[in-house]
Amino acid sequence: ERVLDINPEAAVNVYRIFYLPETAGQFDFTEYDYVVDAIDTVTGKLELAERACRCRIPIISSMGAGNKMDPTAFQVADISQTSVCPLARVMRRELKKRGIYHLKVVYSTEKPMILTECGEAGRETEQGITEDAFVSKKPIPGSNAFVPSVAGLIMAGEVVKDLTKFR
């Protein structure tokens, strides 16, 4: 509703379905000007990227935002230029197997927080895990509200800039 308040001529397609390889056929990519990937599964992300590339539809993909605390660490880059992000590393390897070498992504240069066996939150370093965060008996949430939302805003900005050719 909000999009139509801003632009009554906008076409908004809402799908109440997860995009997975087995549901991909329910989406007609010829209707899209741009694809925004915020899928949490690698198989879904790979299928979406492969299909968008095959249909020559521009796509931007969000890499890992879970277990991050710094919303200012996001960057926009080609997947081939990413570092630090474990999801980007997996995506880069799997995309290469599919003959895809370029994908516009939003990724974080922050190392993800990990849990030690004691339940301590720490950061992975070359030497191992450091205890620089806090102690908790509860598992760390997968993400903080303020981190993935920033990735979404960055992706939205990139889509607008690409579609309007604003640079």
Regions from the language model: what does each represent?
Residues 1-167:
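Adenine nucleotide-associated cytosolic modules
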